[in-house]
């Protein structure tokens, strides 16, 4: 009975937490043979492997001719250490059964052949699970969201692990498969930084009115405690209720780190950010680490990267940031989709066809109130045969029977240009006829497309590869009010992504979670 104790434990562990066993598609690529050393080896009963219902695990042990592989103490110790310190990567060690594995290890010299085989399988299964998680994340974004359009990250975990195993370079495997992106590294640093902060016990800040320099307000005591806690204010402070210059400067530093208007005025947004606890911020960092494992592990040589919650677009060429632009993104109801694509075409003087959502929610109600609504916006109605329909002849009961097209010009909703890229959401980058909004702090205002500040300069930058695009050429095209399209010959990837935390120069940086994704993602990671 004692001999099969650990095998029984394995069966229980596989079924606990109502966790579905990982079912991996059959690996068609031939798995390299595992080079076994002279340490103790035992035969493995394939029935024990089948408990896990994992084709990947089955193929792994076929490569060892169904013998145990982890007889080497150094290799086992390395794997156990990686799983134990997986929390440094924002992962949960118990997801990899670390406690049970350590119990096996503590009795490894006295384990029966059956129990040794059980330990070997459990170690392989959980180490491969860990490798999959650090390469492409624990969760699948396409199962979580309908508007995340990311390419699947393919990973042959058996081949990668076995090659590292045979060359005694398991450490290189762990290092090399993690994302190489700078933001991922900054997030790991952010997790390291936040773990150095003590537990916080500052009370929730309550302030109904804005607080400005030299005001007196009882909320300032807890505000100052928060600023001291987060190191935005240094040294000793009397913790008075007076908003003095020292606190004013600290508030501006805090606001800048959180993407708020750094004007020193303590309003609702600043209070909300100050009220985040250490634990909440740590969860936010962990959620963002997961996202960056979903994204490509390496970025293209030239690319546009949009951070939706930061309302920013950066153009990066050969690892150099060459342009930075403010952007406007979708509202929480009409969210900007997350996309990986490539730039294809610049369109000057674009027309704008009213999309279904805007037609239903905005245009139809407005037309029912005022039949001249579309005419006032220079929008023409066409029937299914392409004939122009007058506003008075428009059938308000069948609005989907028409096409609504806005003529080119500075008043066009897309402004003077748009940049197209392949995607399934009918979105693009474009100018706007409301150019004053880029000065606002909260720019979650569009219907899903991304509006770009000073887009004509951006267009010239990406088109002018051979010096054939001087500014006056663009000016002439714009003045013609004729729609013209030009292929982008230089290769630019487009990364339209979402992240709300990172670090910079050993400082924690956060942004408002405008689509309320962070908390739910963390909960699912820990489910």
Question: Locations of the language-model features?
Answer:
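Sec-dependent signal peptide recognition
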Residues: 2-7
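C-terminal motif of bacterial Sec signal peptides marking the signal peptidase cleavage site
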Residues: 12-15
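Alpha/beta-hydrolase superfamily serine-hydrolase fold, recognizing
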Residues: 155-157
